[in-house]
């Protein structure tokens, strides 16, 4: 594995170029939610990468020395079967997916345990009120259930938080981080709000 990682370093030196440590790709623009300010809502279910295209991207990336792949969306988890298939085909890679978490269930947890190279980063906007306010009623409780499932199986996962003028105080508080740790999260991504997409507000 160390030798594989060195491929990218050697290429950087030889060709005077930068090889990415990770490659981001959108498997689909489809999503089961309709969150405020999400660009994907503009595209609906129109944009999809085929399983073979995703597989080809990973195969090409490995030749460069890239072994980390990050799924964004849309909601990548609407492609659960394909996600697991890619994990099976590339056991030497690690796959992280940003997800709203509502499609994580017991069956998928068992698949994660089996393939061992998939990690979700679940979207959370802070409190139940701010999360449901942006993502829809009941989403916060579904996220909590997904985290409980993952934690109960000892599966690693993280959180993805978009900070806005409405939630910045809450998501930067010690209480929020304590809550994430208590839920079992291993890491957190923070993104600033961009007023694009569905009913986006500039303030």
Specify the residue positions occupied by each region the protein language model found.
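Single conserved hydrophobic/aromatic residue that forms the stacking wall/gate
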Residues: 1-8, 12
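Short, flexible hinge/linker loops that cap or flank conserved catalytic cores
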Residues: 5, 15-19, 63, 89
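Canonical Radical SAM [4Fe-4S] cluster-binding loop centered on the CxxxCxxC motif
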Residues: 17, 22-52
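Short, conserved loop/turn and helix-capping segments at secondary-structure boundaries
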Residues: 48-51, 137-140, 203
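Radical SAM/AdoMet-radical enzyme domain recognition
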Residues: 54-71, 79-192
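A C-terminal junction/extension of Radical SAM enzymes
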Residues: 193-203
């Amino acid at each position: 594995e160390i030798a594989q990682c060195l491929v990218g370093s050697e290429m950087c030196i030889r060709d005077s170029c930068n090889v990415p440590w990770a490659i981001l790709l959108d498997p689909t623009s489809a999503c089961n939610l309709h969150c405020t300010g999400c660009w994907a809502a503009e595209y609906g279910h129109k944009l999809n990468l085929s399983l073979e295209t995703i597989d080809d991207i990973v195969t090409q990336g490995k030749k460069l020395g890239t072994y980390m792949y990050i799924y964004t969306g849309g909601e990548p988890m609407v492609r659960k079967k394909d996600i697991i298939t890619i994990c099976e085909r590339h056991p030497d890679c690690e796959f992280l997916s940003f997800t709203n978490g509502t499609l994580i269930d017991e069956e998928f947890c068992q698949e994660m345990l089996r393939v061992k190279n998939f990690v979700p980063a679940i979207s959370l906007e802070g409190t139940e009120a701010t999360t449901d306010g942006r993502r829809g009623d009941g989403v916060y409780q579904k996220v909590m259930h997904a985290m409980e499932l993952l934690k109960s199986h000892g599966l690693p996962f993280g959180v993805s938080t978009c900070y806005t003028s409405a939630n910045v105080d809450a998501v930067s508080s010690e209480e929020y981080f304590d809550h994430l740790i208590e839920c079992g999260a291993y890491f957190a991504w923070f993104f600033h709000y961009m007023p694009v997409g569905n009913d986006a507000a500039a303030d």
